[in-house]
């Protein structure tokens, strides 16, 4: 049964009266919303009149930034207002495109809740609700942290403001809330309660891309209202005029899922004395016109639609096995992704997804034959502490061809199942690792790391760790590492067979005869096993990084002691060892060069795109300058 809410008469509270210096600093800079809308030449009646909720014509996220009308005339500043640099609403969409993956945006919102653990948060809930106005789904995030006062909610909904200075907090740029909510849906509402300095407040804010697009704004306008709830009935807190507060309220009622003040205030009932609730609605659709996020496939999960799923088709048993592993499931199951999102297990904090708590999972707990290798990053200016790299075989080894490293930063998973070995290689199958790399910086979307020198050194080290671990342990599962014998005296060049190009095209061999060792030995001829073995070793100048060696120099590995006076044995032994070492080095270098080449190509494309955008902006600015000059001449 709904409560009967009564709101006291509007009271005018001067922001300077707050004891917190920061309050005046932020709230004092917020211009009058009514004057902003009037300045945009959009009728307040049109913007705030309560009517059926509107939506964007284009509901696909990747197309929602297209066909945005850029005003051709200069927007004048209202009398008495300070001229300010405008942030066009299109920036909200462009900024959110940093999240290529929708689950990455959800993880950003979870990070905000986890950062609230230091303020007493014990739970964060993620759920789906239905909007009564149009019966569409909405995504809800709710935590019981310290909440936000009027000053805090304005910082949250401002661009690029971050108050997180702790070394343990995940957020740092002050951009995550805007990019993540906009990536998931066109509109977001924030409800927050807090107690600061003995005064209890509750605040409501609306970040609506739909509102900004539909009303033709050329500046990001965020309507917000605040209440003082220290007494029995909530009292509106006014920082401008009563008319401005009413305008904010009317815009909230028109463009939000709630039609009345009672419905708005009901959203605080399950928050308690402190906490925050975020409702994201007008969720994005995919190119097929259906919601990106699926709520119907699993009642206790939120899923991304799997484009590789073959409805009605029987899949190979091995394919089903691979797709049942968490290395595949996390891409489409939010529950699977969240389960390994944080490295250390929480003691007094729960993540509840659609009514069911998420069990944390660390794949290192299931390693077979685990080892811990200490790694100390080397840098010229900073002395970093050593970090432990846990490495081992997954429990499904050797059946599943899965390998890689889960790399965390400040307890948060940044790069899951990072495969550092050459794609398509069987060397390293089943080898997994887990580490926390606080010495490298994550990218803005927290799904990768910045390509620094420390990152490249770590990548090279992880390749070596994978290779060494495989070399030392692959025999456990029946793999063989074919190596040239250490006794150099047993190596002789075949006397009656001059070096020639080997055109042999090997056919697939049974598993017990496949070499899983280093990339040197490619062919073993056992036709004359009683007296000698013939190993084909590629010459250094004929090797390539793909692992295909089409040219060989036959070398005989003679198990019998050489004849006295054979002076060529030591030379051949040294040559083979040098070839093996050189081959490994060239192999790794070529792989790195290919990656660097791809990175350079991506950088060039990005810069070309950025150049085109800058040219377009310059043209628009030129038009604005011309219009301004004409106005000045008329004056």
UniProtKB/Swiss-Prot annotation:
Region spans: Disordered: 491-511
Q: Which InterPro entries match?
A: HATPase_C_sf, MORC_ATPase, Morc_S5
GO process terms (BP): chromatin organization; defense response to virus; DNA repair; plant-type hypersensitive response; positive regulation of defense response to bacterium; positive regulation of defense response to virus by host; positive regulation of plant-type hypersensitive response; positive regulation of systemic acquired resistance
Q: Where in the cell is it found?
A: Nucleus; Endosome
Q: What is this enzyme's EC? A: 3.6.-.-
Q: Which keywords label this protein?
A: ATP-binding, Chromatin regulator, Coiled coil, DNA damage, DNA repair, DNA-binding, Endonuclease, Endosome, Hydrolase, Hypersensitive response, Nuclease, Nucleotide-binding, Nucleus, Plant defense, RNA-binding, RNA-mediated gene silencing
| Gene3D superfamilies listed in its UniProt record | Histidine kinase-like ATPase, C-terminal domain
One Gene Ontology term of the molecular function aspect: DNA binding
The answer to whether keyword Transferase applies is: no
Pfam families annotated for this entry?
HATPase_c_3 (PF13589), Morc6_S5 (PF17942)
Which tissues and organs express this gene's product? Expressed constitutively.
Recite the UniProt cofactor note for this protein.
Answer: Uses preferentially Mn(2+) and, to a lesser extent, Mg(2+) as cofactors.
Enumerate the cofactors the protein uses. Mg(2+); Mn(2+)
Q: One Gene Ontology cellular component annotation? A: nucleus
Q: Any phenotype upon disruption?
A: Loss of ATPase activity. Increased sensitivity to turnip crinkle virus (TCV) leading to spreading hypersensitive response (HR) and impaired control of viral replication and spread. Suppression of HR-like cell death induced by Pseudomonas syringae avrRpt2. Suppression of lesion formation and partial suppression of stunted growth of ssi4 mutant. In the double mutant crt1-2 crh1-1, compromised resistance to avirulent Pseudomonas syringae and Hyaloperonospora arabidopsidis associated with compromised cytosolic calcium accumulation upon infection.
The residues forming a coiled coil are 588-635
Class of the enzyme per the UniProt entry, highest EC level: hydrolase
Q: How does this polypeptide assemble, per the annotation?
A: Homodimer and heterodimer with MORC6. Component of an RNA-directed DNA methylation (RdDM) complex that contains at least MORC6, MORC1/CRT1, MORC2, SWI3D and SUVH9. Binds directly to SUVH2 and SUVH9. Interacts with the resistance proteins RCY1, RPM1, SNC1, RPP8, SSI4 and RPS2. The interactions with various resistance proteins are disrupted when these resistance proteins are activated. Interacts with the PAMP recognition receptor FLS2.
Family that this chain belongs to: Belongs to the MORC ATPase protein family.
This chain's function reads: Mediator of defense signaling triggered by distinct classes of R proteins. Required during hypersensitive response (HR) that confers disease resistance to turnip crinkle virus (TCV). Exhibits ATPase activity. Contributes to resistance against Pseudomonas syringae and Hyaloperonospora arabidopsidis, at early stages prior to cytosolic calcium ions Ca(2+) accumulation. Required for pathogen-associated molecular pattern (PAMP)-triggered immunity (PTI), basal resistance, non-host resistance and systemic acquired resistance (SAR).
What name goes with this protein?
A: Protein MICRORCHIDIA 1
Q: Species name for this entry?
A: Arabidopsis thaliana (Mouse-ear cress)
Query: What would be the name of the gene that encodes this protein?
Result: MORC1
